């Protein structure tokens, strides 16, 4: 599978993941054919929650003015548009419209196979039906505002969301989730407790997510890599798909 094909799957998975959040939680959504914008009320200054995803570059170019008007109506001054690797024409359009390149995030992909994790003595791998402990692990790194939009999932997982926890002595030490769409598993919210770093627990979570997704019929996993997780994903065999470039519009 080519990098372009995997990036297309990553884009579709990111969009499906956001659409699910909008349907089941507090995210607001603005939609035009081929363009979707998301915003979280009460967190107008947290740019992470104000994001535009697109499938059609021409549609996005034509939507920039009404998109800006919608964000202003929400009281949002800053938002971002992730651009797929190689879409230089769209980047030029955004630059002319006042957007600025702010950061770069690697996209990564991995063909799946059945390789269940080998757990260290005294640890268990669990499949929780709620996200409370996975969110708690993520707050160590992103704070409460980074996962507040997922509060409705804290006590009940929606369909197509599958979580994994590594537990030791009744403590949740690492966890993460996958969002599965078609035969593609998107990997999100993988985190390890600060007390359990350098024990390989993040890799165990990933292998658990991979094996479970494969058993459910997924053939590939995709993700956007944080600096903290990038090395781990490479060790697990993920292939780099190029840099996703976040263009930001700041109107404040």
Predicted region positions:
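N-terminal charged segments
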Residues: 1-72
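Conserved beta-hairpin
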Residues: 28-34, 92-100, 160-176
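A conserved beta-turn-beta hairpin within the catalytic core of GNAT-like acetyltransferases
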Residues: 40-50, 102, 179-188, 197
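Acyl-donor-binding surface of acyltransferase catalytic domains
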Residues: 56-131, 247-249
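Conserved acetyl-CoA-binding loop-helix of GNAT-fold acetyltransferases
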Residues: 60-69, 189-194, 198-215, 235
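Conserved GNAT acetyl-CoA-binding A-motif
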Residues: 74-84, 213-225
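Conserved active-site alpha-helix within GNAT-family acetyltransferase domains
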Residues: 87-101, 203, 227-244
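A conserved beta-strand-loop-helix scaffold within acyl/acetyltransferase catalytic domains
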Residues: 145-193
């Amino acid at each position: 599978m080519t990098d372009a094909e995997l990036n297309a799957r990553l884009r579709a998975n990111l969009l499906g993941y956001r659409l699910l959040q909008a349907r089941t939680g507090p995210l607001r959504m603005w939609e035009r054919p081929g363009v979707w914008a998301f915003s979280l009320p009460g967190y107008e200054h947290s740019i992470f929650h104000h994001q535009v995803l697109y499938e059609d570059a021409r549609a996005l170019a034509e939507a920039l003015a009404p998109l800006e008007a919608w964000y202003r109506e929400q009281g949002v001054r800053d938002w971002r548009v992730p651009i797929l690797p190689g879409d230089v024409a769209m980047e030029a359009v955004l630059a002319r419209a006042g957007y600025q390149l702010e950061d770069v995030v690697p996209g990564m992909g991995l063909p799946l196979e059945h390789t269940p994790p080998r757990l260290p003595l005294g640890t268990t791998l669990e499949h929780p039906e709620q996200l409370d402990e996975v969110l708690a692990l993520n707050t160590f790194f992103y704070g409460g505002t980074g996962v507040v939009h997922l509060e409705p999932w804290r006590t009940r997982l929606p369909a197509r969301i599958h979580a994994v926890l590594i537990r030791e002595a009744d403590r949740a030490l690492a966890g993460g989730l996958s969002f599965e769409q078609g035969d593609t598993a998107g990997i999100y919210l993988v985190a390890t407790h600060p007390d359990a770093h350098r024990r390989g627990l993040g890799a165990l979570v990933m292998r658990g997510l991979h094996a479970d997704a494969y058993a459910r019929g997924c053939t590939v996993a995709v993700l956007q890599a944080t600096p903290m997780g990038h090395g781990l994903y490479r060790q697990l065999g993920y292939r780099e798909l190029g840099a996703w470039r976040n263009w930001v519009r700041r109107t404040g």
